[in-house]
Amino acid sequence: MEVAPESTIAPGMIDVHTNGAEDVLFNRDQGSAVEVAARSYVKQGVTGFVAGIITAPWESMLHAASEICESANQLEEQGGIGARCLGIHFEGPFLNPKFRRVHRGDWVLRPTVERAREMIDACHGALVMVTLAPEVEGAEEVARFLFDQGIVCAAGHTAAKYREGMLAIGLGFRTLTHAFNAMPPLDHRDPSLLVAFMQEARTTVQLICDGYHVAPPMVDLLYRTVGTRLVLATDNMPPSGTGYRIDGGVVRSEDGTMAGSALRCDQAVRNLMSYADLPFERAIINASAAPARLLGLERDLGTIAEGKRADFAVWDEELRVVATVVGGTPVYGAVHLHQRTAGIGG
């Protein structure tokens, strides 16, 4: 394939934390949301996403997971329509009630291995990540179980401090959900678990890089500390339900609490470039290779190399996505795939 000479080919991006797309939510629209997300995400240069299920009545969470997996499998068999669903992420219900934010308190549950098994069964083997608070009762046993199953344990919606964070990493927690958000502030005398994840090379740190959830100077500081271990994640929340609105670039609940972002992955890359003074070829790593490593998919995804899956996006000279290819098949902006390329990022 050839593209315009002023264009750049870069690896397809992966969003590991998304709650839906357009006007659909995975929790509510379930299977039907997968195709909408698949077609929507490629417009941003995203070739893979993890469908997020947020805290809700337990049985409804399990049902949503099952429906999403069935729909994703059907789309995979059809092939060539858009971004691929790479698995399921349960953001809850095993959270610290004090840091639940917009997650309803009466739906928060104590983590148990039995419930973890129910998650796995509902996802038909496609559960790839679970966000839980490492300090709550039962979290240690569940974290060990999930780690043994090869499922990523993400620390989030947590009151954990530094020591608890280090213990969590020792148990198998490998990533931090939306750094700085829904956790204690960064305190120089009594640091939170964020510092543990910043220090520990085995981990990654996810960030909502919209300039609202985390101020640009803190984004710069975080990048300087963790570099390619920083994973750009949108945590986008389509404001399609009652009680939510877009305000100042973020989605808020009726009481003003941040409920998620209105962020696109391509904008997250441009923001990181601006906030941390990075060239494109470095910032794109945090939206492609870094999330691929987090999910254990770096052998097939995240970079452009011989033998890897042909997932990539074409960016124009103004760093706007103009075409996306998934598995070697053009799924967006095929008209732009006709001339020679100027360079390859990532």
State what each model feature region is:
Residues 17, 41, 90, 146, ...:
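Conserved, mostly hydrophobic/aromatic
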